[in-house]
Amino acid sequence: EELMASSHYGEHFARHWLDVARYADSAGFANDYARPNAWRYRDYVVRSFNNDKPYDRFVKEQVAGDEMDPDNPENLVATGFLRMGPWEQTGMSVFKETRQMWLDDVTDSVGQTFLAHAMQCAKCHDHKFDPVPTRDYYGMMAVFSTTQFAERKASFLPSESKLGFAGFRSLTQSKIAGYERQKKELAQKINRLKKAETGSAKVGDNGLDPGDEASQSRIFKNLIRHRIELDRIEPVTHSVFTGKTVSMKNVQGRLKMPQDPWGKGYLDPDVIYDGGSVYSQGDAVKPGGLSAAESLGGMEARSFPAGRGKRRLALAEWMVSEKNPLAARVMVNRIWSWHFGLGIAGN
């Protein structure tokens, strides 16, 4: 009781949950851009443990908080869970492939986090002794096919600390101003060299020092990184929304939510990808959960909404159903393991 009454209790067990949720302050890959608002999801998890939030609500907020109540900032912050995996879209990336990488990641992560079952073994084909067939894998993926990225406006909560915001803003803006000066000075130097070396020639050696070219690239990236960092103290959160998919070429910084989520774009096909290849469409599937859980728990097969329906909310409600044999026992096993070092079930 003494330990659970401590505010550090939530911090300690949030660390375990954040490991499961693949929490990261940056997006990974080559650019590894910062996620300046990720701290809000981290603090949400700490608060949830300290406030004894009911587990069913904890699950629903993270998987479908925006579909439950988009006007509740806490719900929007919670959906940061869906974006914690590594992701990058550069000018050299094929959006169709990076989109599929995220769909694979979120499908597998939801399966492992809430149902204790790795899903990606079923991505390419069925396995004789695996209770998750390929059709179930792509059925669960279809739940997320209308889920899109956005940094959404979410007012700061009274429980969120804003200490140090003013100092952070001042420091970051001074760094940006410094890089802007360097950028201007280097641009002037490059222009002088171009005129001196090439004159009015249209083709030829530009006369630039390779070091100057490298500096130009470095300054440009530093400007991007520090402008992104300023979002850390803005009332926005790393979140999602339900709508059509819009192709993106090069993502740097904040992704804004469209006024009409169902206006521009296209609907991802809800199909089995033969061999796991996004370029090889197979049979159509419907959004759904795991058939093995339904048969083991004696659950009635649930019909999930398609089209513009709230697919993620349907999945979250299916997972926390009292008849679902997996979700509750998975969390009990995690908590037991985190307290005593060994789970009730060793796997």
How would you name each of these model-derived features?
Residues E1-G167, T242, S247-Q252, Y273-D274, ...:
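Short, structured secondary-structure elements
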Residues D66, E74, T79-L82, E151-G343:
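Short, functional "switch" segments adjacent to catalytic/cofactor/reactive centers
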